[in-house]
Amino acid sequence: MSDVFELENEIELESDEVILENENVEEIVDAPIPFSMTTNNGIERGKFRSLTLINWNGFFARTFDLDELVTTLSGGNGAGKSTTMAGFVTALIPDLTLLHFRNTTEAGSTGGSRDKGLHGKLRPGVCYAVLDTINSRHQRILVGVRLQQIAGRDKKVDLKTFSIQGVELSQNPTALFTETVGEHQARVLNLNELKDKIENIGAQFKQYHSITDYHGMMFDLGIIPKRLRSASDRSKFYKLIEASLYGGISSAITRSLRDYLLPENLGVRKAFQDMESALRENRMTLEAIKVTQSDRDLFKHLITETTNYVASDYMRNANERRGNIEAALESRREWYKAKAEQNLSQHRLVDLSREVAELAESERTLEVDHQSAVDHLNLVLNALRHQEKITRYQEDIAELTERLEEQKMVVEDANDALEESQAQFEQTEIEIDAVRSQLADYQQALDAQQTRALQYQQAIAALEKAKTLCGLADLSVKNVEDYHAEFDAHAESLTETVLELEHKMSISEAAKSQFDKAYQLVCKIAGEMPRSTAWESAKELLREYPSQKLQAQQTPQLRTKLHELEQRYAQQQSAVKLLNDFNQRANLSLQTAEELEDYHAEQEALIEDISARLSEQVENRSTLRQKRENLTALYDENARKAPAWLTAQAALERLEQQSGERFEHSQDVMNFMQSQLVKERELTMQRDQLEQKRLHLDEQISRLSQPDGSEDPRLNMLAERFGGVLLSELYDDVTIEDAPYFSALYGPSRHAIVVRDLNAVREQLAQLEDCPDDLYLIEGDPTAFDDSVLSAQELELGVVVQVSDRELRYSRFPEIPLFGCAAREKRLEELQIERDEVAEQHAQIAFDVQKCQRLHEHFSQFVGLHLALAFQPNPEALMSEINRERNEIDRELNQFNSGEQQLRIQLDNAKERLQLLNKLIPQLNVLADEDLIDRIEECREQLDIAEQDEYFIRQHGVTLSQLEPIANSLQSDPENYEGLKNELTQAIERQKQVQQRVFALADVVQRKPHFGYEDAGQAETSELNEKLRQRLEQMQAQRDTQREQVRQKQSQFAEYNRVLIQLQSSYDSKYQLLNELIGEISDLGVRADDGAEERARIRRDELHQQLSTSRQRRSYVEKQLTLIESEADNLNRLIRKTERDYKTQRELVVAAKVSWCVVLRLSRNSDMEKRLNRRELAYLSADELRSMSDKALGALRTAVADNEYLRDSLRVSEDSRKPENKVRFFIAVYQHLRERIRQDIIKTDDPIDAIEQMEIELSRLTAELTGREKKLAISSESVANIMRKTIQREQNRIRMLNQGLQNIAFGQVKSVRLVVNIRDTHAMLLDALSGQQDEYQDLFNDNRITFSEAMAKLYQRINPHIDMGQRTAQTIGEELLDYRNYLELEVEVFRGADGWLRAESGALSTGEAIGTGMSILLMVVQSWEEESRRIRGKDIVPCRLLFLDEAARLDGKSISTLFELCERLDMQLLIAAPENISPEKGTTYKLVRKIAGNQEYVHVVGLRGFGATE
């Protein structure tokens, strides 16, 4: 029976409405078979009813009813099969990041690749893809997606998911999404309109804003097999659908079969995570304890820093107060001492002022004399320098005069030679020009006759020239030689005349030069005068010259004599002044030498006496100072020991407070430590006993806490192995009243295992390896077990059981029955109470042990640090005694200092008087010379005359010595010098004229042959030409030589002339300077003799010495005076300052007393004085204490930053003007810490003791939690066992899946199976986890890392060749806790003669690969359903549907196999195939794409399987 139905659509779009023009539905022959649902364990599986496509390309409004098994889409290429499947997949997984339809009409286009093949399958406007499903609860759910193309070049598609529930089964999905607007017209509703329409019909419409929510709804309602929580889950599902759609073996699935087939073992992972979290929590508790310890350290730090902050300021104020009092007393002593010194300085000031006035008057006189001596010395030095220059210049001028005369003669000779050379050169030039002109004429002639004519003309020209120069009109060729000889003789006579005149001229020049020189010397000495009187003046000067020279030679002796007399006179004046000064200072009137010598002896004796007394006092003072230094060293030693001694005393006092004992000697401390060791051993034994008892109770509690009541965990394993139940588990609900009876009834067998068949178990007993010593087995039905198996009689105190015919067992009722849950819970409660009591006792004893240990530790620290000093004498008492002795020595030293000062003053005065006497006594004989002044005047007159002659000789001596040999030349004046000079000039001119005439006549003589030339041959012309050329060359060479000579003589003349000019210039400048120097030395007015400088210098030095001595004395006295005045000012200032300081210090002492009283009152009332008055700090400086306080303040600011009250109190305490605020802050800190003390745990009010007890308690808690951590630690062996069991379970499950694949055959493939193996690297990890290799256990015993990290490190250690990448150890460890990572899954097929092969597309045909791939996918879906069964509703069995496109790749047998597989597994299948598929089963749709006009649509004909039977 087959039903045929047909629906034809023609679609036309007009504006916003879609018009349905034609809808032709053929009548179905019979009513359709109702949609049936198969059952799965009594629960029907959900099914997909239909697929509806609205406004898709070719489908305006088409609903495809889906068969319960196989739905086939048949049609040619481009009929719309892939579009239909794409609509189904889009509604199932509406994720644009995953959708990719490769089989599309837009294949190869860039747009198609961008929209993943979806954009081209839609028409403009709103589109829908809707799935109509019915689940196991018979609920109809429509799920789908609204699609709409987005305008733009990217061809994007917008998707919105929704679901509809509550729609009647009779309602057609197409009618829901369209609205009829005419008889043959309809339009598509948008999403809002659809929502309103659904609500109007009473159904529920829901839109989803995320794909996760959409898939969550589909999973909960049984549409998809697995909950898709993430994009990764959606990707897996899509890959499965894609693999199903395109057929074949998907490498994406086969590579990750573990993720598809093996369920995630969340329970195991959660157990591991819980264990790790418990360990983490325990470690966090330990960290919290460490934090508490750090808080304790913070409190300890707070107490320490607060004590340092306040105690350092407290001691600094105490030191300052004591220092202020001492400073006030010291200021008062200095005040009185300054007043006494002021009185002494005033008397001394008067004496020194009188002496300064006398010294100032004497110094003014000496300064005038000294300045005069300095000026005189400067004049003498200037005169000597001028005289030296004059002498030097006179010598230079004499030398220059001689050189100048010589140079003039040289210049004149050079000039004459130059003129002669130039004349010769000019004559040679004339001859060369003549020869060159003749030669040129010869060369220009065309023939010999022309040359002759030219020579003749030149000869005639030369003859005319000679006539003109010589003035000879009758000159001819015949007489030319005679005239030439005449003129040549005349020229020689003129040359002799010139030479004679030059000789006379040189003699005249020498006489004139000597007369001029002598005349200049006379004028230089006597001044300008006529030349005629020069001889008389020279005679007078030379006559007086010898006597003046003799007188000048006596000048040094006279000057020395005058100097000696003046020096003696200066000594006489100095001696007079020294005597007056001595008498004035000594207040005496001594005049004679005897009186001065007697007084000198008296002063020497006085100095010796005073020196002896001073030496004695110095020795006594040195002894006292040495004693004081010894006392100071002893004081410093005790001062260094004092802080350590005080610290030791404080530590000893704390130990006495903690121990309640009094220690008088170091041996007492050692004895107490020994007793503490004995007490600690006793307490430790008690603590260990209580610990053992607590552990025993914990073990009992742990054993009774088992849920089934088994005391041995091995029994549970055996019960599971034998398939039985523990007897204790069967009687778990027995009442507490019946528990003693049943416990006695079963006796030792109360832990037996109840099994159904003892015979079956008996065979396994021989194979048992690990079991209790006594194992009881009872045969019976665990679901209906009673105690009838035993023959028993109840007595008063027990039960008698007939074990066998010859054996009875009597069991007394136990006092503490443990049979049944109620009895165990009661016993657990009792044990818990007892354990808590034992734990409390253990805690108390442990606390006492810790206390003893801490006390012993404190004593050990005291012994190591302070025992050597704690029992020594008090250093402060010794320091006080030393201070008293030092004060006595200081008083004696002051007395010695005052006496020594007076003696030193007397000694200085005596030494000063003795020094003056030593200077005065050697000069007494000078005072008796009375005629010294007359001798000085006489010597000075003689010296003046001698110095005048000496000056004249010095000024003109050189000139006179030059004048003396040439003075006779002044007798005759050479006046004919100018006449000779003119005559010589005229002779030279005549000589030049005659020489020119001789040259002209010589030229005519040379050309005489030319006059006879008339008809000579060519050879003669050439010979003459050659001669002319040779002559020209000779004359040119001669000219070059003469030119070079002229050039050399010109340069020589220029050089001689330059030297002459330099000498003349030097002579003029030095002569001028000489005259200037002579004038200057005359202006100075002093005599520049040899001894003048020495006398002036000696006089100056003597006056300077006297002035220096006077100035030194005056400077010393003025310094003393200034010192006294400054001391007086300083004393006045000191008096005012000391008075002011005394009053200021007194006011400070009075002002600080008020604040100090408040500090003392606060510290004493709060019992804090002992904590603040730390005597060891008294030895630190104020800066050190302030630095300690500042450092503590900085630490406290950080410590109390979170406590507002303490922070404010600290801020107030920072005011240095109110130290009492620091004490208040100290009290506040202690009060705050007292409030923080838990009085239920710590039995003290003292924060320091509380911190000590807190430390002990925290140590105990740390030990307990460390032990708990060891109990909580995960065993690596247990992890390995869990992993192995889980892997074994999953291997069994895979074997069950393989049973369903055994009979699947496609082509040559006869069977398919899954192969699961454990990876070698992970198998090594499991072996290592089992504990067989102890070297790896260090990782799991390390508390610093988690168990997961330990597993990761172990995996890296046993597999060092594997690169872990950038992943952390925790991530790797978590992966290793997932059993799936231990397994490798592969798919194998049994194919023909090849046997079992790995399932790969390359090894199989297309049909075989499709069938094998479909089998794998079915297995994955089935696995997903089983995996999700726990989290899905129990009344839900999900839909199961797969796809297959292009099914023509399968043969008919494979298609039948596929259909059979779907029927057996209750699965729906949607396949697409060409028209050659026979629709024998399921439902087949024939799709044909047609075009009517400009409209395109798909014609669909549905055919339900004709091979089906009713």
Swiss-Prot record:
Protein's job: Plays a central role in chromosome condensation, segregation and cell cycle progression. Functions as a homodimer, which is essential for chromosome partition. Involved in negative DNA supercoiling in vivo, and by this means organize and compact chromosomes. May achieve or facilitate chromosome segregation by condensation DNA from both sides of a centrally located replisome during cell division.
Molecular functions (GO terms): ATP binding; DNA binding
InterPro entries per UniProt: MukB, MukB/SMC, MukB_hinge, MukB_hinge_sf, MukB_N_dom, P-loop_NTPase
Domains: entry comment: The hinge domain, which separates the large intramolecular coiled coil regions, allows the homodimerization, forming a V-shaped homodimer.
Keywords of the record: ATP-binding, Cell cycle, Cell division, Chromosome partition, Coiled coil, Cytoplasm, DNA condensation, DNA-binding, Nucleotide-binding
Coiled-coil regions listed in the entry: 346-706, 825-1154, 1248-1304
UniProt cross-references to Pfam families, sorted A to Z: MukB, MukB_hinge, SbcC_Walker_B
UniProt name for this protein: Chromosome partition protein MukB
Subunit structure: Homodimerization via its hinge domain. Binds to DNA via its C-terminal region. Interacts, and probably forms a ternary complex, with MukE and MukF via its C-terminal region. The complex formation is stimulated by calcium or magnesium. Interacts with tubulin-related protein FtsZ.
Positions with a binding annotation for ATP: 75-82
